């Protein structure tokens, strides 16, 4: 959804415009603790465990020394799907600033019950989707950053409460700036791929400020 040439252009802009690319988990911890971030702080995320992140994106990031986070769905990884990352590739990326977080096992639309499924069975399935990835991250990569990107960006109050109770930070796909007053059960992110890959409009997003609402 973004070409290597476009991605290189984005990364060169971050470097040339003196953005401070930070590890996502550490940046969020600092925000919540009230610790100031550097000026022009930004974090880079990918959703899904596609192998082209390793083949196309990782060399560009490594060359510039930029940390990044990949939210992985572990189902195709465990199945050995050739289009998805391997655990060994993830371990290599970890050594150069890669961080891997939860995107569920099978990338389901979390709010949809399957045909004939009860609410109780749906809830058991959804919590299993989340918990199984947390276990896999710890077992395979030695740690989990306790972050979850909701598949398709969708969640509800029950899922968000469940995530929060387990110390996990949730991410949607709605646009916005993260700041101390953000909802850490459903944080926003700016898209930078597909229709949103054009650098001219991406610059506006990267230079945006939060606008807290009092009422």
Placement of each model-derived feature along the sequence:
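Conserved beta-strand termini and adjacent loop/short-helix elements that scaffold enzyme active sites
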Residues: 24-27, 71-73, 103, 173, ...
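Metal-dependent polysaccharide deacetylase catalytic core of the NodB/CE4 family, i.e.
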Residues: 1, 17, 32, 37-42, ...
């Amino acid at each position: 959804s973004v070409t290597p040439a476009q991605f290189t252009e984005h990364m060169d802009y971050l470097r040339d415009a003196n953005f401070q690319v930070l590890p996502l988990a550490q940046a969020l911890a600092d925000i919540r603790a009230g610790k100031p971030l550097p000026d022009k702080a930004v974090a880079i995320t990918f959703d899904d465990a596609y192998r082209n992140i390793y083949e196309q994106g990782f060399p560009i990031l490594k060359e510039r020394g930029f940390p990044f986070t990949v939210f992985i769905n572990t189902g195709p990884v465990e199945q050995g799907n050739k289009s998805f990352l391997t655990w060994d590739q993830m371990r290599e990326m970890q050594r150069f600033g890669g961080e891997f977080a939860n995107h569920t096992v099978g990338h389901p639309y979390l709010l949809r019950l399957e045909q004939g499924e009860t609410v109780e069975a749906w809830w058991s399935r959804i919590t299993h989707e989340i918990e199984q990835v947390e276990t896999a991250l710890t077992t395979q990569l030695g740690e989990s950053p306790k972050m979850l990107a909701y598949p398709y960006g969708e969640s509800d109050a029950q899922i968000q409460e469940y995530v929060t109770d387990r110390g996990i930070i949730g991410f949607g796909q709605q646009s916005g700036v993260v700041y101390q007053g953000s909802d850490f059960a459903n944080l926003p992110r700016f898209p930078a791929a597909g229709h949103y890959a054009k650098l001219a409009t991406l610059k506006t997003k990267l230079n945006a400020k939060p606008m807290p609402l009092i009422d």
